[in-house]
Regions:
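Flexible, acidic glycine-rich loops studded with aromatic residues
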Residues: 76-132
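Short secondary-structure capping/turn micro-motifs that flank functional sites
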Residues: 22-24, 48-50, 73-74, 102-104, ...
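Histidine/acidic residue-rich metal-binding segments in metalloenzymes
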Residues: 1-16, 21-37, 48-62, 78-92, ...
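Conserved, mostly hydrophobic/aromatic
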Residues: 41, 64, 98, 139
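Short, basic, glycine/proline-bearing loop/turn elements
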Residues: 36-40, 63-70
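Mid-to-C-terminal alpha-helical segments outside catalytic/metal-binding sites
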Residues: 119-164
Length: 164
């Protein structure tokens, strides 16, 4: 972990790519969290298999990026149930794109695929969007500003149906 500690001391943020459904996924996630001390986990939805690690991520407010469209290339599904479980636990899970040209989906397509397949509510989609800012490495003031923009949009938008 020495190289990572050196990077942090120089002001860099640490994230780890923890592929889904791999051999020893939980061990990889645990190492990223406990040994390396990441500030964010990319992919890593297998964390729902270990409540202690999920609780740790929630307590430490470690963000988790997910990429539903690319998940379906390496797994039987897009891991929507796991994403929803993480969201329900209060974990700062966000939806992102992952090499859009290769996996066929920019961020909007990833949101749409997840919302459509799992019948997400507006509140769930809004929370995922807020999580993307709250778990980012922008300043706290920028986070507040962007989250307020989301709140303002939602307050002024006439949603025609309860689900997106």
């Amino acid at each position: 972990a020495t190289h990572f500690e050196n990077a942090v001391s120089q002001g860099y943020h640490i994230t780890m790519h923890c592929d889904i459904d791999q051999v020893d996924s939980i061990d990889h996630i645990k190492q990223a969290l406990e040994v390396i001390g990441v500030e964010r986990l990319d992919h890593g939805t297998n964390i729902v298999e270990n409540s202690d690690l999920a609780d740790f991520v929630n307590q430490k407010q470690i963000g988790m990026t997910t990429c539903p469209k690319s998940n379906s290339f390496v797994s039987a599904d897009m891991k929507g149930k796991e994403i929803i479980d993480l969201l329900a636990k209060g974990i700062e899970v966000s939806v992102n794109s992952d090499d859009p040209a290769y996996f066929g989906g920019y961020i909007s397509e990833n949101y749409w695929a997840l919302a459509e397949a799992y019948d997400l509510s507006v509140d769930q989609v809004v929370q995922i969007a807020k999580n993307s800012f709250n778990s980012s490495w922008i300043s706290d003031q920028q986070k507040r500003n962007y989250v307020q923009e989301i709140d303002d949009f939602v307050a002024n938008y006439d949603f025609e149906r309860e689900t997106v």
